């Protein structure tokens, strides 16, 4: 992991390079990078993949109902748009409930703008995200 990027190595064999955005979501970038350093995401699947919308991962149980043992994060909503390749934090109905789950947008999803914390943008390897199995 470089200081301004992180690389997800997918079990399907592809690498996804994400440019981090600490300028818009410093707390969330710190959370993601600390979990990466701990190996939290190693072997974690994308448990929710909706074609034309997004792929969601970050739950160690693979069910979509769990996160890390760390406290939830305060929202860092911004004007950054949800476009193809945007990396954003998943959450429950509470704005301040993001923890470890995140999603990558397949296409523009402007209806999420200012409601979910954007923390990165895929720089390369989006074709591997596109190839994730639906589920």
Name these PLM-found stretches.
Residues 1-135:
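Cyclophilin-like peptidyl-prolyl cis-trans isomerases
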């Amino acid at each position: 992991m470089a200081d301004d990027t992180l690389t997800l190595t997918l079990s399907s064999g592809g690498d996804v390079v994400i440019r981090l955005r600490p300028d818009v979501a410093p707390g969330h970038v710190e959370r993601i990078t600390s979990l990466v350093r701990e190996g939290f995401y190693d072997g974690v699947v994308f448990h929710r993949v909706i074609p034309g919308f997004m792929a969601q991962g970050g739950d160690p149980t693979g069910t979509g109902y769990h996160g890390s043992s760390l406290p939830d994060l305060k929202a860092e909503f911004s004007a950054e748009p949800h476009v193809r390749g945007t990396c954003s934090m998943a959450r429950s109905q509470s704005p301040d409930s993001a923890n470890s789950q995140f999603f990558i947008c397949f296409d523009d999803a402007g209806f999420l703008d200012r409601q979910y914390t954007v923390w990165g943008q895929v720089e390369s390897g989006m074709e591997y995200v596109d190839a994730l199995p639906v589920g």
